[in-house]
UniProtKB/Swiss-Prot annotation:
Binds 2 copper ions per subunit. It comes from Canis lupus familiaris (Dog). Residues 495-530 are cytoplasmic. Belongs to the tyrosinase family. Forms an OPN3-dependent complex with DCT in response to blue light in melanocytes. This is a copper-containing oxidase that functions in the formation of pigments such as melanins and other polyphenolic compounds. Catalyzes the initial and rate limiting step in the cascade of reactions leading to melanin production from tyrosine. In addition to hydroxylating tyrosine to DOPA (3,4-dihydroxyphenylalanine), also catalyzes the oxidation of DOPA to DOPA-quinone, and possibly the oxidation of DHI (5,6-dihydroxyindole) to indole-5,6 quinone. The chain crosses the membrane at residues 474-494. Residues 1-18 form the signal peptide. GO terms for biological process: melanin biosynthetic process; pigmentation; response to blue light. The keyword Transmembrane helix applies. InterPro entries: Di-copper_centre_dom_sf, Tyrosinase/Hemocyanin, Tyrosinase_Cu-bd. One of its GO terms (molecular function) is tyrosinase activity. Residues 19-473 are lumenal, melanosome. This is Tyrosinase.
């Protein structure tokens, strides 16, 4: 019933977040390299007449990259998005979006002047209606074609430099699956040649900012799709977990009793079709994923390679990560030592901070543990557990930011792997965002985590508690001292008052005349005689 009601609402809302805007997928836009669609509010490009933004040239950073990618001009993702567009909407103030029709994260209202903070909750703290609504929203997104975005099915060269556009429609959920595939796919070098050592969202500094933006845009898309502006992605706190406690039909899908690699037929997700998982096939054809369904969602949690991932992360592992003071270090890739990012991502040991190619820990451990669709990087976002998992990873990132208060300059400006420098635009997002733009507190982006709000209260209580205990121990002495002080003050006050009166009396007598007036003198004589 809830799903049907949501479907009825669908066309009342327009989405505006993602990859290639439908309005910019024409041969004219591609050949002119301009993506500045009109805003529906006034019909002008980028809402310029209303002061929302303007169509401007894209300024690219010229900071050098690391040595991991030795090519130039062979991948559409290089110097993003310059292969496709060199002019896009640059929005003003609190406006955002490919046509400046949205508000920046954390701002709301017709003119984007209202600021508010949304809270992401632990999935196990959701009420039954909240949990069911979340599952229904996922299903709705899976069955709704994106009205504003399309995906390219060929490279810019295969499109004859834009003169022959190659784009497909895709549903809203799979749009984000496709984004995760596209950002992490191999480079197609022509013929049968490929280059695997490249990833614009993993194994380098941009890992955490990229996935932070991915979740924010996904969250915003669901808010617009459903009209539920208070919607937030729940997180799964997997610390110290002994098994996949969200892998039940009540939550993210139990195990199929007939085939342990499939989901239970009672699950919302057992009928889902996955996309963008056949990387070797795409590479052999020098092609891109086109969004064609590729079979059911696979998951077999716990039956993974235990030599590589002996256990799920512990609370101590998380605390060790948070204790690391360097965001990035050394080569700034998966070989980096004592790097918070590399340790949290799972390429360095959460016991020592030393990179270990034989182990997959922390974030990576959860992907390996799921032993299915989620275990291969490009197509891992097919599994909705991906969202819950990365929301918790983002909460750890947020804890680190609050604990160490790094400046934006802490994020590497140069020499990171391609696409990961501070001023590099993140692939494949339009509108454009730099890696450094997301290296800020979540509260500045309009959201928080329920566990962090609680921990901050606990920190305050832990700070003030020793002083309260000391006060409680000396409280009787303080009361006694106060009483004694009052008594002493009263006595001293009384003595002081008495002395003052005596002094005034003596002073009065001293001021009497030594000789009386004549009349007084005679009167005194009269009295004496009597």
């Amino acid at each position: 019933m809830l799903l049907a009601a949501l479907c009825c609402l669908l066309w009342s809302f327009r989405t505006s977040t993602g990859h290639f805007p439908r309005a910019c997928a024409s041969s004219k836009s591609l050949m002119e390299k301009e993506c500045c669609p009109p805003w529906s509010g006034d019909g002008s490009p980028c809402g310029q007449l209303s002061g929302r933004g303007a169509c401007q040239d894209i300024i690219l950073s010229n900071a050098p990259f690391g040595p991991q990618f030795p090519f130039t001009g062979v991948d559409d993702r290089e110097s993003w998005p310059s292969v496709f567009y060199n002019r896009t909407c640059q929005c003003f103030g609190n406006f955002m979006g490919f046509n400046c029709g949205n508000c920046k994260f954390g701002f709301w209202g017709q003119n984007c002047t209202e600021k508010r903070l949304l809270v992401r909750k632990n999935i196990f703290d959701l009420s039954v209606p909240e949990k069911n609504k979340f599952l229904a929203y996922l299903t709705l997104a899976k069955h709704t074609t994106s009205p504003d975005y399309v995906i390219p099915t060929g490279t810019y060269g295969q499109m004859n430099n834009g003169s022959t556009p190659m784009f497909n429609d895709i549903n809203i959920y799979d749009l984000f699956v496709w984004m995760h595939y596209y950002v992490s796919r191999d480079t197609l070098l022509g013929g049968s040649e490929i280059w695997k050592d490249i990833d614009f969202a993993h194994e380098a500094p941009g890992f955490l900012p990229w996935h932070r933006l991915f979740l924010l845009l996904w969250e915003q898309e669901i808010q617009k799709l459903t009209g539920d502006e208070n919607f937030t992605i729940p997180y799964w706190d997997w610390r110290d977990a002994k098994s996949c406690d969200i892998c039940t039909d009540e939550y993210m899908g139990g195990r199929n009793p007939a085939n342990p690699n499939l989901l239970s037929p009672a699950s919302f997700f057992s009928s889902w079709q996955i996309v963008c998982t056949r990387l070797e096939e795409y590479n052999s054809r020098q092609a891109l994923c086109d969004g064609t369904p590729e079979g059911p969602l696979l998951r077999n949690p716990g039956n993974h390679d235990k030599a590589r991932t002996p256990r799920l992360p512990s609370s101590a592992d998380v605390e060790f990560c948070l204790s690391l003071t360097q965001y990035e270090s050394d080569s700034m890739d998966k070989a980096a030592n004592f790097s918070f990012r590399n340790t949290l991502e799972g390429f360095a040991s959460p016991l020592t901070g030393i990179a270990d190619a034989s182990q997959s820990s922390m974030h990576n451990a959860l992907h390996i543990y799921m032993n299915g669709t989620m275990s291969q990087v490009p197509g891992s976002a097919n599994d909705p557990i991906f969202l819950l998992h990365h929301a918790f990873v983002d909460s750890i990132f947020e804890q680190w930011l609050r604990r160490h208060h790094p400046l934006r300059e802490v994020y590497p400006e140069a020499n990171a792997p391609i696409g990961h420098n501070r001023e590099s635009y993140m692939v494949p997002f339009i509108p454009l965002y730099r890696n450094g733009d997301l290296f800020i507190s979540s509260r500045d982006l309009g959201y928080d985590y329920s566990n962090l709000q609680e921990s901050e209260r606990d920190i305050f209580q832990d700070y003030i508690k020793p002083y309260l205990e000391q006060a409680s121990r000396i409280w009787p002495w303080l009361i006694g001292a106060a009483v004694v002080g009052c008594v002493v003050t009263a006595v001293l006050g009384g003595l002081t008052s008495l002395l003052c009166r005596r002094n005034r009396k003596q002073l009065h007598e001293e001021k009497q005349p030594l000789l009386m007036e004549k009349e007084d003198y005679h009167s005194l004589l009269y009295q004496t005689h009597l």
